[in-house]
A protein has these predicted regions:
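FMN-binding flavodoxin-like domain, especially the glycine-rich phosphate-binding loop
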Residues: 3-36, 44-137
């Protein structure tokens, strides 16, 4: 099975995504990573993937928003309709639940069926998320 992980260019996010990729590849899943800088302005096709995950940071705690480059990356990704998905935000003190709802609404507007969601914290939590995602593929 193949998994596409769309993530922002934040160093903390990249570290968490690399740990998630390692954990998922140990279970035999092929994982491809895409970020706004690496993908340029070309459209990204989600057709060959069985699962699409989005990992991003957010700003604000009263009315959190996801990064603008992540929103543009989601809009440039094609063939998302009907795909299974996972939505994840970096763990924070306040607003992570609201930020997660905002991210899921952006994904659902593109047609993704969000089946798993959460906040990324430490290594143990990332390993547990990788196991859950492996069951979805």
């Amino acid at each position: 099975m193949r998994v596409l992980i769309l993530h922002t260019d934040d160093p903390k996010i990249e570290k968490s995504v690399a740990a998630l990729q390692r954990a998922m590849e140990q279970s035999g899943t092929k994982v491809d990573l895409k970020s706004p800088k690496a993908s340029g302005s070309a459209p990204i096709s989600a057709a060959p993937y069985s699962l699409v995950c989005v990992v991003t940071e957010y700003t604000g705690w009263w009315k959190p928003q996801i990064a603008a480059d992540m929103d543009n990356l989601l809009k440039r990704t094609t063939r998302l309709e009907g795909k299974r998905g996972g939505a994840f935000v970096q763990a924070g003190m306040l607003g992570s639940a609201k930020a997660l709802r905002v991210l899921m609404s952006h994904m659902e507007r593109q047609g993704v069926i969000v089946e798993d969601f959460g906040t990324l914290g430490g290594e143990r939590e990332i390993a547990a998320i990788a196991q859950r995602l492996s069951r979805l593929t």
